Each structure stands twice: as C-alpha cells, then as structure tokens.
Amino acid sequence: MSAQTQRLHPPFYDKRTQRVNSPFSLPAPKTQEKKYLCLLGTVDSVCAPLYDPPLAFTIPQAEVSHMNERNKLLARALYSCVPHVQGSDDYEDDFEDSDFQDGDFDDFEDEDGFDDDDDFEDDDFEYEDEDNDLDFDE
C-alpha cells in the first residue's frame, strides 16, 4: 500500500485498545518528554478529541512553564480541539453570559427570530405523499 493511499484513511478511535489508530504516527517521545505527554494524553491520543469518546486535557500552569516548544505546540493543538476543556476562557465566558447558565430557556430566540416559547403543533405541518406509498391509517 502506497503512502498516498494510506493518507486517505482517517484516524479512528479504537475502543478496545483505547487508542487512536492512524497512518500518521509521531516519532516516539524522548524520555524527558514522557512526563509532559502523560499530562496531555498519549502521543496516539492527539486526534482523540475528534472521536468518541472525546478526551479532555488539563495542564497545570506550573507544568506548562517547564515544557519545551514541541510540547507547548502539542498542548495548544489539543486545547484547540477540545473547547470544553478546563481553562478554555472563550468557552467559559460564552457560557456564563448565556441564558442557559440560569436555565432560562423560555426567552431564547435563535438567529432567525423564532421564539422557542411558542407551542409546537403537529397540525402546523402538512406532508404530501406524492407516491402514495405511505399508509397512515394502519
């Protein structure tokens, strides 16, 4: 199998081994890097936030100050893939400002101005069965 063919196969999360299998593999970490990669997840887990179940990563600030540039880039990439990770200020600010924080769902309107407080009625929608292949009386 050529390298170009392998690139067509996306990585996937193997629930049995709890690892991401990918045709792209990073070089093995050096001994001094293993400590930091444990904080981030394994090297194989770089793509894991995109798959089920997503992996969340939390890195203490004291550890970040001792990381080399390669691991800082890896950490930044992981954080960008997981918006719900602790320390993601943008997500937390949006959540705190939203109506959902207080459980106030009644006054919420989407971008089109549709008020979710309106009662939903099935009679508001009609379905035309052009092919006559559905029998609703059964």
From Swiss-Prot:
Which domain of life, per UniProt? Bacteria
Disordered, as annotated region: 89-138
The protein in question is named Uncharacterized protein TP_0370
**What is the organism of origin for this protein?**
Treponema pallidum (strain Nichols)
